[in-house]
Regions:
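The feature encodes the CheY-like receiver
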Residues: 26, 70-71, 98
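Short hydrophobic/Thr-rich beta-strand motif most characteristic of the beta2 strand and flanking loop
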Residues: 37-44, 52, 114
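Active-site residues of response regulator receiver
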Residues: 66, 94
Length: 137
């Protein structure tokens, strides 16, 4: 008898700009989302993300950003990138739930947030949901 199938997440082909300062987390996310078919622009901080966005001529479909990082936080980076790329969808992630900036993000229903630590399947599903949703997500 065959094992029951797990719910699968749709494969993607979109481009995702990832901003994550922790190398082990960044590597896991790149590996996971690449396996799901996404093109990943990998950065470790806000300044690098802004530079990468400016140099990238193609469409960036999603900004997947940590919130608490050295230098600019993910919220500030998202605000700047949304000004440059109004169609950009954003998914914030953090494990620092008591942070004031995380609380600010959570207070706006337009923002989409994923709490760390997360299961790989939860990340893949949330990315797909945001990409299939409206630009204000």
């Amino acid at each position: 008898m065959a094992a029951p199938s797990l719910k699968t997440t749709s494969r993607g082909k979109e481009t995702i700009l990832l901003v994550e300062d922790e190398e082990i987390v960044r590597t896991m996310i790149v590996t996971l989302l690449s396996r799901h078919g996404y093109q990943i622009l990998e950065t470790s901080n806000g300044e690098d993300a802004l530079r990468t966005s400016d140099r990238y001529d193609g469409h960036i479909h999603l900004l997947l950003t940590d919130v608490i990082m050295p230098g600019e936080n993910g919220y500030a980076v998202a605000s700047k990138l949304r000004a440059r790329r109004p169609e950009l969808k954003v998914l914030f992630m953090s494990g620092h739930m008591d942070s004031a900036i995380v609380q600010k993000i959570l207070s706006d229903p337009r923002n989409v947030f994923l709490r760390k630590p997360f299961k790989p399947t939860a990340l893949a599903q949330k990315v797909r949901e945001v990409l299939e949703g409206s630009p204000s997500q």
